[in-house]
Amino acid sequence: MATNYIFVTGGVVSSLGKGIAAASLAAILEARGLNVTIMKLDPYINVDPGTMSPTQHGEVFVTQDGAETDLDLGHYERFIRTKMTKRNNFTTGKIYSEVLRKERRGDYLGATIQVIPHITNEIKDRVIAGAQGHDVVIVEVGGTVGDIESLPFLEALRQLAVQVGREHTLFMHLTLVPYIPTAGEVKTKPTQHSVKELLSIGIQPDVLICRSDRMIPPNERAKIALFCNVAERAVISLKDVNSIYQIPALLKSQGLDDFVCERFRLTCPEADLTEWEQVLYKQANPVGEVTIGMVGKYTELPDAYKSVNEALKHAGLTNRLSVSIKYIDSQDVETKGVEVLKGVDGILVPGGFGYRGVEGKIRTAQYARENKIPYLGICLGMQIALIEYARNVAGLTKANSSEFDKDCEQPVVALITEWQDAEGNTEVRTDESDLGGTMRLGAQQCHLVSGSHARELYGKETIEERHRHRYEVNNTLLPQIEKAGLKVTGLSADKKLVEIIEVPNHPWFVACQFHPEFTSTPRDGHPLFAGFVKAAYENHKKSVK
């Protein structure tokens, strides 16, 4: 079967939910038995989002093969079974970097390098490479139509549609249809102008996804179809919903998947959305509730912890609980004290970088340990838990990480100088290494110690989880900390790197060096998050007695 391409663009304003719409359509097509993948093309000049501020860009999602990518790839993996790879996300910066590398190498035989054809050809080549082996590939273009940054991508997709044939391509455009209270009606003019902008660069959309706070009336959909030269059945109303997991059913109810299959002449069974119905049922019928305190430094933008937020919700589904997240700035713990932690049923310290707010996180771990509050530490959340235990229990009063104090006398956490990547190649790092693309990244095996919380939750000896860090537990000082009672319950494949620690004589205190949030899904959840939320609920029941 030839690969079919769905190109997703957005107009009028940003943040309309192109990623969610693309992932939801992919989920329906997957439920029809098709092999689907999704790609994200980002117009910014950064090579990848690895060094971008989380408060500007949101979280960095790490793929199985170690690519640092846009957070939308997290949505893709939560909606479909296909795992994303480095092929599923690339930026303008990465495209230009590769074209310039080829030019320096002489690949273009002295040609004058131009946006057309060299940049557009590189974009097309990457899209085609990422689509290999799939029935349908959905390609989302970041940004808004009309932005100068996205023009090379749109031109490349226009060319690709001609190259592979319009019978194998479909353009889906998301647009805003605002409701004006004073007029008492929705307005279609922004959509018409957005489509006009697309037409000016040679793209005629085949499907319009109309975002609004309400369903678009049939007469307005007919008007949009007429003025935008789109079939009326291809004008889809996408209203605001309580849960993003309602969107697959909402799109299916309007026949979007049927339209796509007919367009590509695909014969496949009806979509079975039973799993999504079960997710929604659990979400709508919780048997209890818990409040999780998330202590971090990027709390002003929840998207900075997008996968953690979603993983907590998934754990709620697994336990039939409603999970409320209380965001706590770690600097507030430093300035206002542990009073800001009162009233939560469990405490989670997610990953992060840099010194700001670290002492607040260390005090948070101490508070959770001493007050028997369920604690889950992720990446930096494990490192600060280790520092706290070393200082206050193991007698290493000057314990710290060399990330925060390069002249630390007792560096219980230090820079990884050498390790093997997924392909077995030796990676070497120093303090002088670039920040971008120089971490321990991607899926790594971990061996679990029997009798531990981790082993009980996972139910197996060897697991695989994704990493994103450049500092590790210092094995030189580890024996003294273990002697004081801390349990190392997870080790890397070569048994040299600490992956999981647990505090004994505590209801639930588990911290891991990897990022379990990246593999949590609404249908399957994740063992560590499920165990953590369950323990938080047990703590909640004690507190209300």
Curated annotation (Swiss-Prot):
It holds the Pfam family GATase. It is an enzyme of class 6 (ligase). UTP binds at residues 14, 187-192, 223. One of its GO terms (cellular component) is cytosol. The keyword Ligase applies. Residues 1-266 are annotated as: Amidoligase domain. Residues 291-542 form the Glutamine amidotransferase type-1 domain. GO terms for molecular function: ATP binding; CTP synthase activity; glutaminase activity; identical protein binding; metal ion binding. It comes from Haemophilus influenzae (strain 86-028NP). This is CTP synthase. Pathway: Pyrimidine metabolism; CTP biosynthesis via de novo pathway; CTP from UDP: step 2/2. The active site is at 379 (nucleophile), 515, 517. ATP binds at residues 15-20, 72, 239-241. PANTHER family: CTP SYNTHASE, CTP SYNTHASE-RELATED. It catalyses: UTP + L-glutamine + ATP + H2O = CTP + L-glutamate + ADP + phosphate + 2 H(+); L-glutamine + H2O = L-glutamate + NH4(+); UTP + NH4(+) + ATP = CTP + ADP + phosphate + 2 H(+). The keyword Nucleotide-binding applies. One of its GO terms (biological process) is 'de novo' CTP biosynthetic process. Homotetramer. L-glutamine binds at residues 352, 380-383, 403, 470. NCBIfam families: PRK05380.1 (NF003792), PyrG (TIGR00337). Its EC number is 6.3.4.2. CTP binds at residues 14, 147-149, 187-192, 223. SUPFAM superfamilies: Class I glutamine amidotransferase-like (SSF52317), P-loop containing nucleoside triphosphate hydrolases (SSF52540). Catalyzes the ATP-dependent amination of UTP to CTP with either L-glutamine or ammonia as the source of nitrogen. Regulates intracellular CTP levels through interactions with the four ribonucleotide triphosphates. CTPSs have evolved a hybrid strategy for distinguishing between UTP and CTP. The overlapping regions of the product feedback inhibitory and substrate sites recognize a common feature in both compounds, the triphosphate moiety. To differentiate isosteric substrate and product pyrimidine rings, an additional pocket far from the expected kinase/ligase catalytic site, specifically recognizes the cytosine and ribose portions of the product inhibitor.
